[in-house]
Amino acid sequence: MSNKNSIEGILLNKIPFKEKNVIGHVLLRNGHKVSVVFYGGQGGGKRHIGSTLQLGYLISFLASGTHKSSFEMLGSNEYKEKWHHEAITTNVKAYYLMCFFIECLEKFSPLATNAHDLSENSNEQVGLFRLLSNAIFRLEKVCHEKSYETGTELGLFLTKAMIELGVFPNSRICEVSGNILKDSDLAYLSAEKGGFVLEQFLEAEDKRLIDRTMSSKIGLHSRLEKISRSQYAEVKNIEFSLNECRELFKFICYQQHMSPSDFKTYTALI
C-alpha cells in the first residue's frame, strides 16, 4: 500500500456491513473522525483470515472515494494495522477502560466534513488524537508490567482530557473566596462553580463528596497541577480514588453540556 496518500487513525468502533464488510469510525491523526467502509473487513474467507480491524488499533488505509460529497463516509479496499495492543485484551478491567477512552473521543471529536479535515495539515484538533493514542499506549504498557490500577489510569486520562478540551480548572485559586490553594488544602472540584472550592465555603452535600483519604496525602488540585506540567507517559506516583474520578468526569460533562449517563461504558468502571 502506498504511503503517499494513506490516511492513519485509531479505530473507534466497528459494525458488520453486508456479508464481508465493516463500517468503522476512525479518529484521524488530526483529531477529526471519519466513517469508513472497509471492504472485506470482517476477514474470514477460504483461508479464514482474521480481521486486522480491532478497537484501539492504529490503522493505515487508502480512501477509494467518497460515498457522500460531504465526506461523511469513505470507502477503502486497502488497509493495514500500524500498531496494536496485546496486553490490554488480557485484562478485563483495562479493556473496559480502553472502551471508555474510545467512547469519550467518539463523543468529543468533530466529524470530518471536507477535504481539509482529512489532511494532517488540519491540526486544530490534533490534541484529541494525542490524548487517545497516549492513553492506549500507556494502558498497554502498565498492563504488560502488571501495574494496572483503574483509578490512576482513569484519573490521568480525565485530567489530560480537560486540558485538550479547554476546560482545565484553575488549580491554584478557590473560586468562591479567591484564596490561594495550598497542596494540603481540602478542596472540591465544583462543576457549577467552574473550579475548586475550599471546604469551608462548600454546602454540606459537597463537603460529603470530598475524598479525605486521598486529599490528606496531596489535594486533588495539586495532583491536577502536577499532571498538567508533565508528559502523559512521564506521569508517576500519582493516585486517584474512584470518587475523585467521578468528580473529574462530572466536571467535564458539565462543561461539555453532557451527562455521565450519556456514556454507556462509564457504568462498567464506576
Residue spans of the language-model regions?
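Non-catalytic alpha-helical scaffolds and adjoining flexible linkers that form interface surfaces
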Residues: 1-22, 27-270
